[in-house]
Amino acid sequence: SMGGHGAFYLAFRHQDVWGAAGSMSGGLDIRPFPNNWDIAKRLGSYAENKEAWENNTVIKLLYLLDGKSLNLIFDCGTADFFYDCNKRMHQALLERNIPHDYTERPGAHTWEYWTNSIKYHLMFFDDFFRKN
């Protein structure tokens, strides 16, 4: 959810601190949701503060990535309301030749989906920490 956005946001901006980041069903583009999660309280309304929204949505921060210093994993269920923005993030990373682990599978924004998804994230991070 928004924790996935936060994890990627912090990792993208602080690659000297983070070597890997993961997101399950993440809101990787906040712009389609201008009235949700009190984001407007922090960034101002989208209509009046588009630049702030552009500067703080993860999908627009890919220019910070060199494709070498950060290991990424993310996934989303095909019935999740964040599915489209995850698919767009995957495409944008592919276009920039940035390595990442992306999975989409049946499921929605539910604990049932995340209970399955977490297993793959744990394997990813286990591999990352064993190598580093």
Located regions from the model:
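Non-catalytic cap/lid and distal C-terminal segments of serine-dependent acyl enzymes
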Residues: 1-132
